[in-house]
Regions:
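Type III/flagellar secretion export determinants
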Residues: 1-297
Length: 297
């Protein structure tokens, strides 16, 4: 199953302030992305391309622990349940919120100090059953983690906080354990596109933000659908298949072009769309297209 997630709004600047964006204080989300992008860079891997460079005086090993703690303190009350049998199969019996914070913090610190990010597929096989259970809870994985056949990306993301996970193979999805998610912005979204997105969505209700994320993800789903000569649906390529494609990774793709395509679609099907929905959709895609231009995409 592919889950859809929307990154929390980080930058809150108005458009006239767009050139000052990198001078703004970092949110917990931005900080964890900056820290773990620096960690991955030490091991020859790409983190968030939109992350600000890590330039703090705090040693990175300490920043690994503190950035996770800050992120957890901000998001744990809304993202995690700590009641066994509450409907979440990943909840650990007799474990508290503080247990999860401390346990995963130690897992992250150990992974950094022991070089686990160099070969995550091998490293996760050294983790104990208890450590894997903590990771399962952090990442909301439905089933216990099997380390035998994980891809490099799926293993790596077990060792990264949720908002620092990366789409390593650029297939448009983020794999963690056996789970896939589509998120936008993701680790490969350029900084100017992320700024345009956040300027466009900062005042939207979360439900509408998720709707817009799903509309962007729909492009990948459609690109992987196959039809016969009569236009009948035959099958869909699955993540990992040789014929799986990510349109956003193709030469010539632009988000402004995608926004233009959505506006063309709305014009073509205007008579079939409820007027209030049509107005909202046109307003969103026109705003996103304009902001992309303002931020230089």
């Amino acid at each position: 199953m592919i889950h859809v997630t929307s990154a929390p709004v980080g930058y809150q600047e108005s458009l006239p302030q767009r050139n000052l964006a990198l001078n703004h204080p970092q949110s917990a989300e931005q900080q964890v992305q900056a820290v773990f992008s620096a960690v991955l860079a030490q091991f020859g891997k790409q983190g968030y391309v939109s992350a600000q460079p890590y330039a703090e005086s705090t040693p990175l090993v300490e920043a690994v622990a503190t950035s996770w703690e800050q992120w957890f303190n901000e998001f744990s009350s809304t993202r995690y349940s700590f009641v066994a049998d509450s409907g979440s199969p990943s909840v650990r019996a007799n474990k508290t919120r503080d247990d999860l914070r401390v346990d995963y913090q130690q897992i992250l610190t150990n992974a950094y100090q022991r070089g686990g990010y160099a070969d995550p597929s091998s490293y996760v096989k050294t983790l104990s059953k208890e450590e894997l259970a903590a990771i399962q809870q952090v990442h909301h994985l439905a089933d216990p983690i099997s380390t035998d056949s994980l891809s490099s990306e799926a293993a790596l993301n077990l060792l990264l906080p949720p908002d620092a996970q990366v789409d390593e193979n650029r297939d448009g999805l983020t794999a963690a354990g056996a789970a896939y998610s589509f998120r936008f912005p993701d680790s490969n979204t350029p900084a100017n596109v992320r700024l345009a997105w956040e300027a466009t969505t900062k005042d939207l209700p979360e439900e509408e933000r998720l709707t817009r994320v799903m509309q962007i993800g729909l492009q990948i789903i459609i690109a992987n659908m196959h039809f016969d000569s009569n236009g009948q649906y035959v099958r869909s390529s699955q993540p990992g298949d040789a014929d799986w494609v990510n349109p956003q990774a193709t030469t010539g793709f632009s988000f402004r072009g995608m926004a233009s395509d959505w506006l063309d679609y709305l014009d073509g099907f205007a008579s079939q769309i409820p007027p209030d929905q049509l107005q909202r959709d046109r307003a969103f895609w026109s705003s996103f297209q304009a902001n992309l231009g303002l931020f230089g995409e």
